[in-house]
Amino acid sequence: MEKEKVKLDEVLKFLFSTSNKVLVKLLNGIFNENFSVDEVELTVSNNEFVEDDLGILRGDMFFDILNKDYNKASYHIEFQTKNDNTMIVRMFEYGFKKGKEQLKSFKNYTEDIRTIYFPKQKVIFFEENKNIKNQLKLKIIFPDEKEIIYTVDVMKYWEYSDEQVREKKMYPLIPLQLFKLRKELEKAHNKKDLNRIKELSNNAKELAGKLAKQSAILFEADEILGEDFHKMLLAIQNLIEYLNRNYMNDENIENEVTTMTKTLYDPEVEKRGIEKGREEGIEEGINLTKKVFKLASQGETIGNISKICKISEEKVKEILD
């Protein structure tokens, strides 16, 4: 696997562990939804599927959104640094595997027809490439010559400025603006163009400062929690470290960016974030109890309630008692 893909995966996995408040807004921005943070419950769902040869098919991110009526919508996001002609086939595999996995929880089907629901899917490409279209398409032809065209929408991240990312409230993607410098840095590095590398190094430092300050403003405006703010600053540091050690070799930039982010990060932020998390935990407990009782009143078994709510059967019994 390419080193930039590995680093991007690491950073994105970290950023996608931000609070549910932030992740709901992120999904709204990516999929043009309009979920209210206070009216839905978001969970990160399984992203690993066992294949027939016992190998593991692993996707990037899967989410489930449950509204106040307990209707569920599923979402799937894949991240790509470069164009890949096999991506659409993998998206079909991921979607089918997730649909098959969720089939077990559906009870409303006729004896002779089963229904598999694909999640809403999107591929986010981070580096510019003129060959990347707005949609990925796969034609599937059955033996009777019936055809279907399976499509997945694409988000071209390089087309978004930091202001546009912020306006769409895709806050965890803000630090990834730094990754947009990678391609130019690689060109300058390969050409051994020291002047261009120095210029891009200065650009990276300035951009890191700008993104960190934007994150601080979001925290002050209560758009993100303290834990989210902390993770965004750490992602900025991590990306600067990656760019520097692979392309820039600037002996000062890592320390300068780390110092800058520390001056923005109030030690009380973490404490406030934990306190708010406890308050949210109480509210989540109340909502869980309501959900368990409603499912029980609808005739769901303890086993099914356990699977739907993602809690143990013992916990279900404890709530119902």
Describe these PLM feature segments.
Residues M1-D250:
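Conserved single-residue anchors adjacent to enzymatic active/cofactor-binding motifs
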Residues M248-D321:
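Intrinsic-disorder/low-complexity detector
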